[in-house]
């Protein structure tokens, strides 16, 4: 993968810690969710306000075609929130009679069909490192039809995370954080219902993703690949469990960087990006293009940030 350089970054403080994802609505307002469950709106004028509250930790989100904000929470499942009143409704809290404890990201098609990921069936967000270390491959991709029926499309994914639709609507692109891989789930054409790998052996762990105005797939690289975590992946499950039982300071750690990469949606080539270290921002977990700027969110800092969209 090419080496990408720094960019001029503007950091915007949030009224709380760890805004995990960031999305934009049709009116130009940005939305994010804090670790304590507060849902925050950043208006086109830059004014920051708290609009709602979730009981679980808000993670990936998207603006639905009916105007509501779809929010993945852990625990809690998939919610829909009225962006004016802050009222929330549970859309999915279980799949195949199992609690949806780690809903990770969500996207909606124009016909109202919703797709969402679950990172792991065992852990919640509070213990996400356990899923990475144990490397069970128990994440999944699901579809919620407009009538409310939920169908499992894919399972055995290695920490399924970011999810976006391609600009032409022919496929979904999803990220596997522990697998360090981007894949396409085809929605139309002769390959419909099948999966092809878009990019693999990534130099960092991908988190949330989004589709840019030109169709490029923007990927939040939450942390560079960790040699210790890589070495654990093929080991016996009992050894991985022992490592997970160690004190946090002895486990593989996240390296705080500002790291985001754009991939060609057809070839999987890395075509643009930004990478740098800052004392006031890093650990990028979400990103979205908005008015020529690349906005980024982070679980490591009480802020979001933005820079010019890299060419």
List each language-model region with its residue ranges.
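Sequence-structural signature of mature extracellular/luminal beta-sheet repeat domains
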Residues: 1-311
């Amino acid at each position: 993968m090419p080496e990408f350089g720094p960019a001029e970054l503007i950091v915007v403080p949030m009224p709380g810690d760890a805004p995990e994802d960031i999305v934009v609505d049709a009116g130009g307002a940005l939305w994010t969710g804090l670790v304590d469950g507060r849902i925050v709106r950043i208006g086109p004028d830059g004014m920051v306000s708290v609009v709602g509250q979730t009981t679980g930790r808000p993670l990936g989100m998207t603006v639905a075609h009916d105007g509501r904000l779809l929010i993945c929470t852990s625990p809690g499942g998939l919610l829909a929130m009225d962006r004016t009143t802050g009222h929330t409704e549970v859309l999915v809290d279980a799949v195949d009679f199992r609690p949806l404890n780690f809903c990770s990201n969500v996207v909606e098609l124009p016909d109202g069909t919703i797709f969402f990921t679950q990172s792991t069936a065992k852990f919640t967000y509070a213990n996400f490192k356990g899923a990475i270390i144990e490397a069970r491959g128990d994440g999944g991709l699901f579809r919620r039809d407009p009538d409310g029926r939920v169908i499992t499309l894919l399972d055995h994914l290695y920490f399924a995370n970011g999810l976006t639709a391609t600009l032409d609507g022919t496929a979904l692109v999803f990220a596997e954080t522990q697998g360090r891989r981007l894949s396409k789930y085809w929605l139309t054409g002769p390959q419909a219902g099948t999966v092809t790998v878009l990019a693999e052996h990534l130099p960092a762990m991908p988190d949330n993703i989004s589709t840019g105005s030109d169709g490029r797939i923007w990927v939040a690289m939450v942390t560079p690949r960790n040699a210790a975590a890589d070495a654990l992946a093929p080991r016996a499950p009992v050894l991985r469990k022992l490592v997970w039982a160690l004190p946090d300071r002895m486990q593989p750690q996240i390296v705080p960087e500002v790291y985001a990469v754009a991939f060609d949606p057809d070839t999987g080539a890395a075509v643009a990006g930004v990478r740098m270290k800052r004392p006031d921002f890093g650990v990028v977990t979400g990103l979205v293009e908005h008015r020529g700027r690349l906005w980024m969110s982070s679980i490591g800092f009480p802020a979001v940030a933005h820079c010019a969209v890299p060419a």
